[in-house]
């Protein structure tokens, strides 16, 4: 059997949208294939990895059933040379697709924690059979940048595609440019047909629609038509509907007429889980020490964290060395300095003392009272996470003998956090207060 025929037969097993978005551009590589190895080329590395994970076993099974032979399936990114040979028709086909989703943004790859479980639950619930457009509609997810709003939005899109639904994903900028382009070309009917006839409309950063009244008017009518036809609408923003500047009251009212879910900065355990998930996806092996260092040294922007992980791997690969804690510190030093220069240990000490109703002089003393020791350890822990101070510098600040005393306190408070959920929550609360204050 011609292996290319496998994809055609597989097409019958999938929804039209799922096949078009993920497998239609997969090409059989006859030159690299052997009797027991079938190689397929995907448009890029990200798509290759996704198809290998999601469809590799299914393609192998399909091939064995229909040919009677077993084969290993290898999905790889096509080379630049092969890419240049792609026809203009293929490029036009890709551009014509109404949905451009990151295939790795799925519910399975989304790490759930206290900071995002409500938003996750609402989005996941509507992807169950017959729930789209009926259970929660619209869904409005808001929160600071880099916390997973786009991931969640596109997870709904990918799940909807697998259900055979027509999905439109667009940022506000995409929507505005699309409208402006069609207006200039006298093809607004095409614009209306695209957006009004979808099953699922996903709009990222909806706050930027507030640039002109005409854009908002168009979106208002599109919103109403999709909603009236039981289509699902999900939007993301940096603020809740009532705080959106430049957005008309009638749009704010419609945005709020459904589920409003916020995503807040993740707690430490969630950040660690996210880092592990990112490492797993990118096939990067980091020790627990490095993972904990990244989690406690960087802010809460997930894209930023993933960028550091990829940079670490690139450094190690190029230099031909192992990823060590020392390498991590070297790669991250400028980044951490930039983030931490506005936060001082005095700021941390002041806030912790206020929270525990303790004098700063007591925390800096040698007193061994339990509440003072705990407060001291929290200050040290937060100083390690939020400032660029080294252990010797912290030892000097607390007038301790040397940095080993600081290391001991860090170890003790880390153990306490792992065994005491309320303490962990309190420290996360203090950390967020310090970060907010430093940005004001």
From Swiss-Prot:
Lyase among keywords: no
Gene that encodes the chain: dnaA
Subunit structure and binding partners: Oligomerizes as a right-handed, spiral filament on DNA at oriC.
List of residues binding ATP: 146, 148-150
Name of a matching Pfam family: Bac_DnaA_C
Stretch list, region Domain III, AAA+ region: 100-316
Region feature (Domain IV, binds dsDNA): 317-440
Record comment regarding domains: Domain I is involved in oligomerization and binding regulators, domain II is flexibile and of varying length in different bacteria, domain III forms the AAA+ region, while domain IV binds dsDNA.
Record InterPro entries: AAA+_ATPase, Chromosome_initiator_DnaA, Chromosome_initiator_DnaA-like, Chromosome_initiator_DnaA_CS, DnaA_C, DnaA_dom, DnaA_N_dom, DnaA_N_sf
Region listing for Domain II, in residue ranges: 74-99
GO biological process: DNA replication initiation; regulation of DNA replication
An annotated GO cellular component: cytoplasm
Chain positions covered by the region annotation Domain I, interacts with DnaA modulators: 1-74
Entry superkingdom: Bacteria
Identification of the protein by name: Chromosomal replication initiator protein DnaA
CDD domains the record matches: AAA, Bac_DnaA_C
Keywords: ATP-binding, Cytoplasm, DNA replication, DNA-binding, Lipid-binding, Nucleotide-binding
Subcellular location: Cytoplasm
Record flagged with keyword DNA-binding: yes
Function of the molecule: Plays an essential role in the initiation and regulation of chromosomal replication. ATP-DnaA binds to the origin of replication (oriC) to initiate formation of the DNA replication initiation complex once per cell cycle. Binds the DnaA box (a 9 base pair repeat at the origin) and separates the double-stranded (ds)DNA. Forms a right-handed helical filament on oriC DNA; dsDNA binds to the exterior of the filament while single-stranded (ss)DNA is stabiized in the filament's interior.
Upper lineage: Bacteria, Pseudomonadati, Campylobacterota, Epsilonproteobacteria, Campylobacterales
């Amino acid at each position: 059997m011609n292996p290319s025929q496998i994809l055609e037969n597989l097409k019958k097993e999938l929804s039209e949208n799922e096949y078009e978005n993920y497998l239609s551009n997969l090409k059989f590589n006859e030159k690299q294939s052997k009797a027991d190895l079938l190689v397929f080329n995907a448009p890029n590395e990200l798509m290759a990895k996704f198809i290998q994970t999601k469809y590799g076993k299914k393609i192998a099974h399909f091939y064995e059933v229909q040919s009677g032979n077993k084969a290993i399936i290898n999905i790889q990114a096509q080379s630049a040379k092969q890419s240049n040979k792609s026809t203009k028709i293929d490029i036009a086909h890709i551009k014509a697709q109404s949905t451009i989703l990151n295939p790795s943004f799925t519910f399975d790859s989304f790490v759930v924690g206290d900071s995002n479980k409500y938003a996750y639950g609402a989005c996941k619930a509507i992807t169950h059979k017959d729930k789209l457009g009926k259970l929660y509609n619209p869904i409005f997810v808001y929160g600071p940048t880099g916390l997973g709003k786009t991931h969640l939005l596109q997870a709904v899109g990918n799940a909807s595609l697998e259900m055979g639904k027509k999905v439109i994903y667009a940022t506000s900028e995409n929507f505005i440019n699309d409208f402006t382009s069609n207006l200039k070309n006298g093809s607004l009917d095409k614009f209306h047909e695209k957006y009004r006839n979808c099953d699922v409309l996903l709009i990222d950063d909806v706050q930027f629609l507030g640039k002109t009244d005409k854009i908002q008017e168009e979106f208002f009518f599109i919103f109403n038509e999709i909603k009236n036809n039981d289509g699902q609408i999900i939007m993301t923003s940096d603020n809740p509907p009532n705080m959106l500047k430049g957005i008309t009251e009638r749009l704010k009212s419609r945005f709020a007429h459904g589920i409003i879910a916020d995503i807040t900065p993740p707690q430490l355990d969630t950040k660690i889980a996210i880092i592990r998930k990112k490492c797993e996806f990118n096939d990067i092996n980091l020790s627990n020490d490095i993972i904990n260092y990244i989690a406690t040294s960087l802010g809460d922007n997930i894209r930023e964290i993933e960028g550091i992980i990829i940079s670490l791997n690139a450094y190690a690969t190029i230099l031909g060395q192992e990823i060590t804690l020392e390498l991590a510190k070297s790669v991250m030093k400028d980044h951490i300095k930039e983030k931490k220069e506005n936060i001082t240990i005095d700021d941390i000490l002041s806030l912790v003392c206020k929270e525990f109703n303790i004098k700063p002089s007591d925390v800096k003393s040698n007193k061994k009272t339990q509440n003072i020791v705990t407060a001291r350890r929290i200050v040290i822990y937060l100083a390690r996470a939020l400032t660029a101070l080294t252990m010797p510098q912290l030892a000097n600040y607390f007038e301790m003998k040397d940095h080993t005393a600081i290391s001991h306190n860090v170890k003790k408070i880390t153990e306490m956090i792992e065994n005491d959920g309320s303490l962990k929550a309190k420290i996360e609360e203090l950390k967020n207060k310090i970060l907010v204050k430093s940005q004001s």
